[in-house]
């Protein structure tokens, strides 16, 4: 995983996007996690990485060099490339291994201005305390935080955590929302602070119905 991805919303026009994972593994926190594709993918690869006390797979040095190569290619092309981080984990999970690897990520983000980092989380309440402090004074232009919302309950909770509870006079940064999997209707009338909405359903055997609203 990590070279050009087929995830449509990572594309920037005709420039394909990438996925980058700081670890593999996570803990399920809401109904959106119940049929986690990343967990299934990891199990097929022979890894048991899910759960609060579970291990997290740390990735190779070569894997960590990839963003610099993507940045150089984007700069040469004169067009930014998007990077979904992390498709096999949650960057803002409160886990010791994730914390160690997250600290490795921030210097890479700073060194890759031609990459637009899409940091999608189900834990927006953790973002403010886990990003570098200087980001809260001047949010990086190449970083877009996002949160998953599968139904009205989880949109309201995460929107409050992300946009309402954490706004102050120092920083106002835009968020995107992944309404995927769409498990129940959502009234997006109160989308203050949201710059982009992604919509999708589950796929594969046993996929739950897509419930748009």
Predicted regions, residues:
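Conserved AdoMet/S-adenosylmethionine-binding subsite of the radical SAM
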Residues: 63-213
